[in-house]
Amino acid sequence: MEGISNFKTPSKLSEKKKSVLCSTPTINIPASPFMQKLGFGTGVNVYLMKRSPRGLSHSPWAVKKINPICNDHYRSVYQKRLMDEAKILKSLHHPNIVGYRAFTEANDGSLCLAMEYGGEKSLNDLIEERYKASQDPFPAAIILKVALNMARGLKYLHQEKKLLHGDIKSSNVVIKGDFETIKICDVGVSLPLDENMTVTDPEACYIGTEPWKPKEAVEENGVITDKADIFAFGLTLWEMMTLSIPHINLSNDDDDEDKTFDESDFDDEAYYAALGTRPPINMEELDESYQKVIELFSVCTNEDPKDRPSAAHIVEALETDV
């Protein structure tokens, strides 16, 4: 993947952009203020586009747009990433991966990626809601259901499409209703895998999100394989058990439940030392029903990638139980 310095603000529509847009029929996408904001990510916002022309009922879309406050330097980077995501997403067809709908320009001239509306909230939204309500961890059965659906999506990406997702975490999983559907989203930083499930392209760069990175992505010259997604998958299960972000301890005083987070309490050295390792679990908070979840989390977060299961093995192990 090219470095940021190699990108320049385009003065006119690039040939790559033209080729992607030409394959998309003309679609009237409203300006951002006229759509409900669903969420946001690095450099982008996601909106809900309701489609019911002339009284007809159409399924809504989720529309991803570049954040308007981005400066020109970063805008070109995010535009390329959005175009890459559109190209990849258009080739994917799986019930556990958010579907492609269109790639076009909105009425305000901004680039838009229209996707299947996978659900009202991300898994991260549900985790935060549960944490703020001081609720218990998600039931083991729900965690295993999420695990199976995510693993099916990853199996498809790894085996059939030879793609590493590259940024698995709770905020990149969308949920509809009461876990009626579970879909992986945000394939904008995906990387090609070779026949050995390894990222060998010298131009490819693993992006990920820091707390979910495996050891091989933290270390210099680490070899990235499909097992990088598996490590992050394991930490996503950990999120559902702990209602926390990996390696972020908001309070060092377990006896003071009302203690609020103070940046001065954050231990940078301990945080960076913990990256790529398996975070601890308070076993006293989890009953015996979580045994299979804990076992799956543990094997997926082994530091040596060779000791982690493939997505296909996870699917095989879970399909008989969920």
Curated annotation (Swiss-Prot):
GO terms, molecular function: ATP binding; MAP kinase kinase activity; protein serine kinase activity; protein serine/threonine kinase activity; protein tyrosine kinase activity
Any matching Pfam family: Pkinase
Regulation: Activated by phosphorylation.
Tissue specificity as recorded in UniProt: Expressed in the testis and placenta. In the testis, restrictedly expressed in outer cell layer of seminiferous tubules.
Gene Ontology CC: nucleus
Region (PDZ-interaction): 320-322
Keyword flag Hydrolase: no
Residue stretches spanning the membrane: none
Keyword match Isomerase: no
Leader peptide range in chain numbering: none
Active-site feature positions: D167
UniProt superkingdom: Eukaryota
Positions of post-translational Phosphothreonine modification: T9, T24
Keywords: Acetylation, ATP-binding, Isopeptide bond, Kinase, Nucleotide-binding, Phosphoprotein, Serine/threonine-protein kinase, Transferase, Ubl conjugation
Binding site for ATP: L38, G39, F40, G41, T42, G43, V44, N45, V46, K64
Top class in the EC scheme: transferase
Reaction it catalyzes: L-seryl-[protein] + ATP = O-phospho-L-seryl-[protein] + ADP + H(+); L-threonyl-[protein] + ATP = O-phospho-L-threonyl-[protein] + ADP + H(+); L-tyrosyl-[protein] + ATP = O-phospho-L-tyrosyl-[protein] + ADP + H(+)
GO biological process, one term: negative regulation of inflammatory response
Domain Protein kinase: 32-322
Modified sites of kind N-acetylmethionine: M1
EC number: 2.7.12.2
Annotated family: Belongs to the protein kinase superfamily. STE Ser/Thr protein kinase family. MAP kinase kinase subfamily.
Oligomeric form and interacting partners: Interacts with DLG1 and TP53.
Function: Phosphorylates MAP kinase p38. Seems to be active only in mitosis. May also play a role in the activation of lymphoid cells. When phosphorylated, forms a complex with TP53, leading to TP53 destabilization and attenuation of G2/M checkpoint during doxorubicin-induced DNA damage.
Protein name as annotated: Lymphokine-activated killer T-cell-originated protein kinase
